[in-house]
């Protein structure tokens, strides 16, 4: 049975960044719910042993496994940023690619997240 753990991300008062650590195995994933406003920028950097962990970012109301991601990390890499289109709770999904998931690999990761105001 798949385990899909979802955790709400809270930033320390006065801070717009945090480092999250986690672990999952096989086809399981880890999901973080992050509130942000339209026009803000979500920056990320993910590190894992063997570079097995990737992220997808889903817009508010969209669900992993059901909807298309707003941002697909496996096509971009392990760090980047995305300008967010609407206010709401975004889901950051941490997962591994099918080839290593089939081998039931255990993946430990560190994920740096930062929310920035877009300076226009």
Locations of regions flagged by a protein language model:
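N-terminal functional modules and adjacent low-complexity/disordered segments of proteins
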Residues: 6, 19, 52-53, 108
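C-terminal edge strands of extracellular/lumenal beta-sandwich accessory domains
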Residues: 2-10, 32, 90-120
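Acidic, Ser/Thr/Pro-rich low-complexity intrinsically disordered segments
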Residues: 23-88, 93-97
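Transition segment at domain starts
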Residues: 1-28
